[in-house]
């Protein structure tokens, strides 16, 4: 699938490096072969796995259907939390949602907000098949994730993993910087022009991107966002986001092994395609399960709200259609964090009406108040919807199923920036 080139490691600025990392030496950088316009020939098992995954994607897309507008809010955040988890960045759904709504929070939370924006851009901005994907598009996608870095492809050698800060001890060394532009042009053309099974195309595009590792940072999150671009452009899914990172985060070692198999030799490509297809199926199942849980929670919260009004002697106990409380309930899955100001703007009501509705929903146990360390009210949160995001993104890390009360598997340590 590629070749190696020998390079010399001789750091110009060795300040702060350990003695081992300061030591010069030679290392091998991997150069992947450019992608062909036609998909490679696969074995029967890989073809079958990809076809099965495509059927499952279509079924999940159909099941979620008209609810995708609300569900995608939760699915994108589940995907972004898990994609960041793989890179060692841990944020709870509630902290993410609050940071996104208030535009403030820890740097970790703001980083995941950036991941959310990149995933949204990968779907909305790059899914039009009439638009030819360019290297500039991919650079912009990465810049949304890592706005603190200069936009553009890397102009120096980078590496992945290892026990120190040196390519001599790295787990994997991507191609030299001077080859990155042509390899990325080739990848952009592949994403735009190649036909065939979308699952196979997404698997190859993602693995090739991760192999090129075209940026100094943000490669993993950008590469996983690219998966959604490929699937959406190919109409493999039209409505639903498939949270594939929730599966990758469940077994990071298997995910990395799959990428290594892709790089090893052509005969091992099938191994990666099968693993990717299986991850896609499991992610589709996660999306369907979330849809079912949200539908159940919608009914539960409305019932609890009606019961609360009845107990308080409010007549009628069922709020009228069009009431602010009903409008809030109908959109909570898509807007699980609220402020009085956001309710005023969203539903065009007065501050007094917004406060009354939020207070009534809080008294019924539908919403919770969130305060800062000094006791100042920050916002209202629909914690049970946010808990569903946690269940979705955690389920694979504890082996699937209902994860409430279970301990998650440890993720990777936060990576050093190279």
Which residues does each predicted region cover?
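FIC/Doc superfamily catalytic core
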Residues: 1-418
């Amino acid at each position: 699938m590629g070749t190696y080139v020998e390079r010399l490691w001789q750091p110009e600025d060795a300040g702060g490096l350990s003695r081992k990392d300061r030591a010069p030496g030679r290392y091998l950088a991997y150069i992947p072969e450019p992608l062909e316009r036609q998909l490679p020939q696969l074995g029967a098992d890989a073809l079958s796995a990809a076809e099965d995954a495509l059927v499952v994607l279509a079924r999940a897309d159909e099941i979620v259907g008209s609810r995708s507008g609300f569900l995608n809010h939760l699915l994108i955040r589940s995907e972004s939390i898990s994609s960041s988890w793989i890179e060692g960045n841990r944020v709870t759904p509630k902290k993410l949602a609050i940071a996104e709504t208030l535009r403030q929070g820890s740097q970790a939370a703001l980083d995941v907000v950036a991941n959310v924006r990149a995933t949204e851009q990968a779907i909305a901005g790059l899914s039009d098949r009439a638009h030819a994907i360019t290297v500039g598009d991919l650079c912009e996608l990465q810049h949304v994730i890592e706005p603190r870095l200069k936009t553009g492809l890397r102009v120096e050698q980078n590496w992945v993993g290892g026990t120190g800060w040196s390519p001599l001890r790295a787990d994997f060394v991507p191609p030299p910087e001077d080859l990155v532009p042509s390899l990325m042009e080739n990848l952009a053309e592949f994403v735009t022009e190649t036909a065939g099974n979308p699952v196979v195309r997404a698997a190859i595009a993602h693995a090739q991107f991760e192999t090129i590792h075209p940026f100094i940072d943000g490669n993993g999150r950008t590469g996983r966002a690219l998966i959604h671009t490929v699937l959406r452009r190919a109409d493999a899914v039209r409505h639903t986001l498939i949270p594939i990172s929730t599966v990758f985060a469940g077994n990071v070692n298997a995910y990395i092994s799959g990428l290594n198999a892709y790089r090893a030799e052509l005969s091992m490509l099938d191994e990666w395609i099968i693993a990717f297809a299986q991850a896609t199926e499991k992610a589709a199942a996660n999306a369907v399960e979330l849809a079912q849980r949200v539908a159940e929670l919608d009914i539960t919260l409305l019932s609890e709200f009606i019961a609360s009004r009845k107990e308080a002697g409010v007549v009628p106990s069922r709020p009228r259609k069009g009431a602010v409380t009903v409008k809030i309930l109908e959109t909570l899955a898509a807007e699980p964090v609220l402020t009085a100001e956001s309710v005023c703007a969203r539903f065009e009501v007065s501050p007094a009406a917004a406060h009354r509705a939020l207070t009534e929903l809080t008294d019924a146990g539908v919403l919770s108040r969130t305060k800062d360390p000094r006791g100042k009210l920050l916002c209202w949160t629909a914690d049970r919807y946010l808990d569903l995001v946690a269940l979705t993104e955690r389920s694979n890390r504890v082996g699937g199923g209902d994860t409430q009360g279970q301990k998650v598997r440890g993720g990777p340590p936060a990576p050093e920036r190279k």
